[in-house]
Structure formats: structure tokens, C-alpha cells
Amino acid sequence: MSFKMNVTTFRYFRPSCFLLFFIGWVALVAPIAAADNKDYQIGDKLPAPAKSKIKPMPSATATVAYKEKTWDDLMPKNWDPMASLKGLNLDKLKDSDPRAIEALEKIREAWNNAPVEPTLNGERIRIPGFVIPLDKSGDKVREFLLVPYFGACIHTPPPPPNQIIHVRTSKPVLKMRTMDAMWVSGVMQIGNVNTEMGQAGYQLKAEWIAPYP
């Protein structure tokens, strides 16, 4: 049975558990990809696609230039998610330790205010990720979150806002399932969107969506 974690659940993490999760998330930022077999495990990122497997865009969008982006590109280069933990020996901290509680509050604040990359505003981008449908009507989806690793917002707490994209489509996407791996292309905009599954720091109006790879 899966444990569904949203933003509300996130508040009730024990300090030591949250700190360990935070360390684990930072490790996920590293470019470690899942094997190319679609049997994704929690925390897996998408493998680099073979060019022969990339689905061509339809003729209506093929002439539009999209810049392919990675999830690292969505984080400013000078942002250090570990800055709040420098000087702390996490192995020796207990839940009742005031330093653990103080560190937890600092991390939550830094996490919720994670900076976005301003140069992406208004860019036409193409990025792969895992989807979390938000307004499913039957087998049709018009709104979803795109996240960088399998299980984000569902089996683990949400990543920081600069690692979540809120996507809207002009036409419904059929038969999209939670944690499907998809290519999404469109115009990126900077702007927070709060959902029950997580806070997105980016918005994207999708012009082309296709299964990954």
C-alpha cells in the first residue's frame, strides 16, 4: 500500500526524519538515471533517451525551436540547498535537540523559497519528467504537475518549487496516468502555483506532449 504524502503531511515530519529526507533529496539532484526499462523505482530519474527512440514532433510544431532543458537548469547555479546544514553533525542530533528543530525550520523556509532561474521566463523549452494529473475527468487531463523523479509528491514529500512545473494544456491529454514519463514542450513562465500535491515555481502552457522517450 502506497503512502500518499502532500504538503500538509510534510509539516509533521520529525526533525531528524526531515533532515535525512532533505539529504536524500540533494542526492537525487545528482545526474543518476534509471535503467532504460521503464521499471522505475522511487527516486529514479529518467535515463538519457537514444536518439532513435525520440518521437518526432507533429508538423504543426516541428518548425518551432524548443530548447531542451534538464532539471538542473531550473535551479540557479549559485543556489546551495545544503547551506542551512553547514556545520551540523546530523548523526548526533536528536528530535528534541534545539539545533535540529532550528535546522528544520531553516530548511523548510529555504525549501519553500527555493529560487527559480529567471532566464527561463518566456523561453520555449522541452523537458522530460513524470506527471501528476490534477484535474482528471474520465480519461482526460488538462492540468498536471511535472516532476523530476519517480514518486515525487506521491511516495515522498514534494521537491522544492524550483523542481516542479505546473502544466496546462489547450487540449485534453487522453489516458495520462500518475507517474507516466512524458516529454513536455511549451512556453515557460515564472510564477508560483499552489496545489494540494505541491508548490510549483514554474508554469508552462503545453504546446506538445508525448510519451518519453
Question: What kind of region is each of these model predictions?
Answer:
Residues 33-213:
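OB-fold and OB-like single-stranded nucleic-acid-recognition modules
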Residues 16-29:
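Bacterial N-terminal signal peptides
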Residues 10-11, 25, 34:
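Serine/threonine-rich, low-complexity intrinsically disordered segments
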Residues 1-14:
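N-terminal secretory signal peptides that target proteins for export/translocation
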Residues 12-14, 18-19, 111, 120:
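Extended, compositionally biased low-complexity polar/Lys-Gly-rich tracts
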